[in-house]
């Protein structure tokens, strides 16, 4: 296996590439300094901030016993085993911190970056334990199942043939605006699963992958239950703790945040708008638009209702005519916190209020919108944790590596290293394609053939005076020879062009195959492909390999991993 690291600032090829804010966050220089100084509280490159964060968390009060009891119950339900039980128990101590990550639930674990996030949290927690052995750091994966947008999580894709095949289960048991996590699969999940397995080619690992999927995805299981069980089965030895946020026990611990949101509404929205103005001053766009109240209400069917705030002391629930005073809404929060759900603005605040979050492992998009929340953290009286970029990979199969070698040859860049060819492809794929095709079409040969014709004609013309003196009848023979030589050169040229076109078609087909593998549907591979495609070919040991790569490299570079 070969590994190459690419700077995020050089990756310009995918049409849905990495945001400018994220590229600056992972780079060096004054732009990063301004961004960190004005939009975040902590810098993971400053040693002093680590000690500061340890002190801040040690001085705060958390409901640790309640948190541990809830997590133990949840992880037993998901099949977490003794490894997770021991890890959860550590949280009872005030010297235990959490390294948190999270992800929207996805079909069959969703896109590759779900796995990368989980492993990144495990690795970062291990690093902190090595740096601060007197403390414990536990990796926690937040199961984002309260979202009501079903279409995105209920989807996954794998390579099949020369392209991609997409999978979406049908469901007849889902209500509009129902939370994704509580959605139960009906019989159609079996059809989706078998169709998915049929697209996996025969291999030594296919049965293992099929067994894991069938044990997790079956009629009657919830979306959250299936996702959680599969994630744990893929990482049986990792101390990853799963957290379900719509557990009533969790909502009771988060009730203080809900109360302050209602008490001060629309203050949190004003905070986000003000912080977004700071971002715009720095040259970045805002990713998130806050609402007057950044909470949803859950009705008896588990459907999320927007909370509207039409006047200073009135609140309404979407779809209902009843009005609530601020006092009545606060009573509802106090009596039934399980009926409330944070939106994207409030979710990080809830997370870092309930958990002793030392660091949050975030994707590129998350880092962009977390930059809008600094003032809101201050509004709720807590400090933002370290925001650490997750690991980012492009997995390259052997057949694609061979195509990269071919591109090295045909583009006339044999002196390039393997890293340089990847850097060239990731920075300007279209330019590389054009260069390769031009070379394959032998456009540079046209002047060579013309030069050959002219040299032959000049050589024969030099014979003419001498031949005419010897025997004038030789002159017509010379003319015929010139025509014959022209025809020979033309014939060679035509055959060369035909051979070039064949090579051109073959090369173009190979380049398109590589493009599909590296940038499926024009975006980063990790945002679309499902891990099962690779596990079927290379076994579940691949997850251990990915962890080793994260242990050996910084997550502030994109990792090209040749399998």
Swiss-Prot record:
Presence of the UniProt keyword Ligase in the record: yes
Transmembrane segments: none
Annotated InterPro entries: Bacillithiol_biosynth_BshC (IPR011199), CC_BshC (IPR055399), Rossmann-like_BshC (IPR055398)
Its EC number(s): 6.-.-.-
UniProt keyword annotation of Lipid biosynthesis present: no
Pfam families, per database record: CC_BshC (PF24850), Rossmann-like_BshC (PF10079)
Keywords in alphabetical order: Coiled coil, Ligase
Coiled coil spans: 498-518
GO MF term (any one): ligase activity
Database matches in NCBIfam families: thiol_BshC (TIGR03998)
Similarity section: Belongs to the BshC family.
HAMAP family, per the entry: BshC (MF_01867)
Protein name: Putative cysteine ligase BshC
UniProt organism field: Chlorobium luteolum (strain DSM 273 / BCRC 81028 / 2530)
Gene expressing this chain: bshC
């Amino acid at each position: 296996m070969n590994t190459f690291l690419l700077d995020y600032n050089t990756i310009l090829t995918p049409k849905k590439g990495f945001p400018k804010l994220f590229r600056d966050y992972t780079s060096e220089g004054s732009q990063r300094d301004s961004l960190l100084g004005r939009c975040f509280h902590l810098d993971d490159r400053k040693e002093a901030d680590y000690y500061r964060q340890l002190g801040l968390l040690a001085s705060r009060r958390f409901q640790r016993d309640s948190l541990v009891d809830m997590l133990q119950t949840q992880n037993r339900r998901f099949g977490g085993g003794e490894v997770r039980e021991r890890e959860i128990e550590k949280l009872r101590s005030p010297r235990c911190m959490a390294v948190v990550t999270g992800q929207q639930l996805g079909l069959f674990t969703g896109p590759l970056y779900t796995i990368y996030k989980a492993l990144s949290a495990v690795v970062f927690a291990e690093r902190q334990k090595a740096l601060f052995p007197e403390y414990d750091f536990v990796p926690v994966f937040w199961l984002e199942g309260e979202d009501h947008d079903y279409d995105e999580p209920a989807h996954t894709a794998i390579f099949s043939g020369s392209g991609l095949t997409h999978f979406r289960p049908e469901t007849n048991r889902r209500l509009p605006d129902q939370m994704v996590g509580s959605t139960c699969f009906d019989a159609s999940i079996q059809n989706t699963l078998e169709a998915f397995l049929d697209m996996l080619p025969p291999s030594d690992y296919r049965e293992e992958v099929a067994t894991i999927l069938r044990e997790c995805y079956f009629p009657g299981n919830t979306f959250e239950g299936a996702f959680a069980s599969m994630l744990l089965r893929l990482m049986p030895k990792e101390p990853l703790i799963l957290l379900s946020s719509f557990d009533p026990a969790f909502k009771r611990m988060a009730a203080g945040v809900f109360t302050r949101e209602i008490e001060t509404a629309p203050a949190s929205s004003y905070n986000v708008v003000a912080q977004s103005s700071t971002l715009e001053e720095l040259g970045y766009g805002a990713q998130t638009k806050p609402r007057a109240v950044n909470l949803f209400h859950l009705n008896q069917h588990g459907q999320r209702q927007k909370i509207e705030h039409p006047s200073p002391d009135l609140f309404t629930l979407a779809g209902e005519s009843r009005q609530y005073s601020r006092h009545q809404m606060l009573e509802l929060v106090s009596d039934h916190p399980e009926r409330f759900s944070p939106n994207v603005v409030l979710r990080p605040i809830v997370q870092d209020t309930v958990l002793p979050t030392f660091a949050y492992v975030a994707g590129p998009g998350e880092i962009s919108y977390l930059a809008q929340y600094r003032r809101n953290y201050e509004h709720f009286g807590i400090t933002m944790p370290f925001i650490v970029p997750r690991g980012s990979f492009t997995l390259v199969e052997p057949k694609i590596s061979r195509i990269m070698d071919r591109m090295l040859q045909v583009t006339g860049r044999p002196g390039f290293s393997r890293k340089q060819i990847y850097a060239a492809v990731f920075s300007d794929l279209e330019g590389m394609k054009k260069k390769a095709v031009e070379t394959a079409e032998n456009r540079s040969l046209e002047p060579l053939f013309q030069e050959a014709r002219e040299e032959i004609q000049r050589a024969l013309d030099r014979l003419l005076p001498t031949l005419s003196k010897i025997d004038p009848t030789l002159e017509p023979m010379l003319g015929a020879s010139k025509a014959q030589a022209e025809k020979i050169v033309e014939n060679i040229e035509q055959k060369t062009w035909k051979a070039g076109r064949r090579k051109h078609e073959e090369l173009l087909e190979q380049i398109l195959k590589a493009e599909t593998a590296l940038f499926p549907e024009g975006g980063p591979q990790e945002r679309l492909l499902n891990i099962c495609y690779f596990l079927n070919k290379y076994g579940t040991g691949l997850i251990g390999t990915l962890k080793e790569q994260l242990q050996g490299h910084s997550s502030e570079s994109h990792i090209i991993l040749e399998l």
